[in-house]
Amino acid sequence: MTIAIGKSSKQPQGLFDSMDDWLRRDRFVFVGWSGLLLFPCAYFALGGWLTGTTFVTSWYTHGLASSYLEGCNFLTAAVSTPANSLAHSLLLLWGPEAQGDFTRWCQLGGLWAFVAFHGAFGLIGFMLRQFEIARSVGLRPYNAIAFTGPIAVFVSVFLIYPLGQSGWFFAPSFGVAAIFRFILFFQGFHNWTLNPFHMMGVAGVLGAALLCAIHGATVENTIFEDGDGANTFRAFNPTQSEETYSMVTANRFWSQIFGVAFANKRWLHFFMLFVPVTGLWMSAIGVVGLALNLRAYDFVSQEIRAAEDPEFETFYTKNILLNEGIRAWMAAQDQPHENLVFPEEVLPRGNAL
């Protein structure tokens, strides 16, 4: 038997080591250093949104009812943006606008700024959480990299776009119908659907949905052998003890369908990662361009010919007229403080009139 004589080699832990040990301890819900950012920000963002949609009116900022208390439902309630006159103020509760008055702060739109900033940092915290856990268990950080796509879209739409405009007023309010209205605004004032970055974003998101459906169906088709049971859903009730997934079989199937197929699993799954993330990033870049009022495609020759020839019209010229109508109606409706009055002769009409 060996007896060790002397002092223990274990050194007392410092504050940082103690915190690191507690934060990264194996537990049912991992906390981690990223949790110090994620959990408070997510809690405040969600709590602010629930508070705003339940109790807070948009009468003082938009002239609208926007809460359950006023009769809205889940689709029409929203936490609306601050008034246009407040420009890019951070709208701190203790700031010069609200001066510590919580009711006034809510009336001015302070909850929108509260939810937007805490939401942005909450998303960043969630990305860091994926990175931290991946590092702990020895995975590559591709999940965290993929999540930069949603973060880029959120930050560009809710923060960068209004920063390029005259104020937070022009950001989307946090609500379903409010987001739909913002999309109509984007189309009318920026011709967003004809923007090449929007086109790349649509291709990325819908392409990713197609890839996901194809991949799921292919794996489901090849993961188990068919049995003899007359059950339509026998694939979900396998009698095998082990999976029989075959990349070779899947490759042969798609080679016959398209003439080409992915050669290996790594390239296949990288492509499924690349398509949606690139689409989201392209959309985010496009929104940053809109913040600077960069224009989409303009087919001026068609517009000139349509103006000269009442019988000439294309889908493009019809959409341009539609955009003019959206602008003429939404500008006066959404910005009553501007007292916009358009004479009838400038309102859009069809080319044949």
Curated annotation (Swiss-Prot):
Chlorophyll a PD2 binds at H198. The D1/D2 heterodimer binds P680, chlorophylls that are the primary electron donor of PSII, and subsequent electron acceptors. It shares a non-heme iron and each subunit binds pheophytin, quinone, additional chlorophylls, carotenoids and lipids. There is also a Cl(-1) ion associated with D1 and D2, which is required for oxygen evolution. The PSII complex binds additional chlorophylls, carotenoids and specific lipids. It holds the Pfam family Photo_RC. Pheophytin a binds at Q130, N143. CDD domains: Photosystem-II_D2. It is an enzyme of class 1 (oxidoreductase). PROSITE patterns: REACTION_CENTER (PS00244). The chain crosses the membrane at residues 41-61, 125-141, 153-166, 208-228, 279-295. The modification Phosphothreonine is found at T2. InterPro entries: D1/D2, Photo_II_D1/D2_sf, Photo_RC_L/M, Photo_RC_L/M_CS, PSII_PsbD/D2. Chlorophyll a ChlzD2 binds at H118. Fe cation binds at H215, H269. It is a multi-pass membrane protein. One of its GO terms (cellular component) is photosystem II. The modification N-acetylthreonine is found at T2. A plastoquinone binds at H215, F262. NCBIfam families: psbD. Photosystem II (PSII) is a light-driven water:plastoquinone oxidoreductase that uses light energy to abstract electrons from H(2)O, generating O(2) and a proton gradient subsequently used for ATP formation. It consists of a core antenna complex that captures photons, and an electron transfer chain that converts photonic excitation into a charge separation. The D1/D2 (PsbA/PsbD) reaction center heterodimer binds P680, the primary electron donor of PSII as well as several subsequent electron acceptors. D2 is needed for assembly of a stable PSII complex. 2 of the reaction center chlorophylls (ChlD1 and ChlD2) are entirely coordinated by water. Belongs to the reaction center PufL/M/PsbA/D family. This is Photosystem II D2 protein. It comes from Staurastrum punctulatum. The lineage of its organism: Eukaryota, Viridiplantae, Streptophyta, Zygnematophyceae, Zygnematophycidae.
